[in-house]
Structures are given as C-alpha cells and as structure tokens.
C-alpha cells in the first residue's frame, strides 16, 4: 500500500497509464487481425491497403514504447511476408 502522497499519486497514474496502454495494445491486435483477415480473403489490393494502415499503427505504438521496437519489426516482417506470399 502506498504510504506517501507521492506514492499514492504514482499508483493513480499507473492505473491510468495501464488502461491507456492496454487500449493501445488492443488496437495493435485489431490491426494485425484485419491484415490477416484480408490476406485470408485473398483480396490483394484490400490487404495491401490494410497492411499500410497496420504498419502505421504498429510504428506509432512502438514509438510510444508500448511494445518493443523489435516486436514491432517482427509483426511488420511477418505480415509483409504473408502479403507477399499472396501474390
């Protein structure tokens, strides 16, 4: 239990930051799923458009250090490979 005023404030901030970061991670998962769904549907043009939007989302979340930059690179690489295999 936080005893000092500073510790109580940091605990409040941590709860708020955790909620925001969880939301951002959910956005990431949704973006990745959208690309995978478009690839499974076999629509290359739609998949390419969704892929570009997804890459933007992944990079933005990595820049905010919500996920590690290597994890972001791994996601982008695997999605790009799946998109390329569709051709």
From Swiss-Prot:
Lineage: Bacteria, Pseudomonadati, Pseudomonadota, Betaproteobacteria, Burkholderiales
NCBIfam families listed in its UniProt record: S20 (TIGR00029)
InterPro entries listed in its UniProt record: Ribosomal_bS20, Ribosomal_bS20_sf
Signal peptide: none
GO cellular component terms given for this protein: cytosol; small ribosomal subunit
GO MF entries: small ribosomal subunit rRNA binding; structural constituent of ribosome
Keywords: Ribonucleoprotein, Ribosomal protein, RNA-binding, rRNA-binding
Family: Belongs to the bacterial ribosomal protein bS20 family.
Pfam families: Ribosomal_S20p (PF01649)
Function of the protein: Binds directly to 16S ribosomal RNA.
Gene3D superfamilies reported in the protein's UniProt record: Ribosomal protein S20
Bias type Polar residues, positions: 20-29
Annotated protein name in UniProt: Small ribosomal subunit protein bS20
Organism encoding this protein: Herminiimonas arsenicoxydans
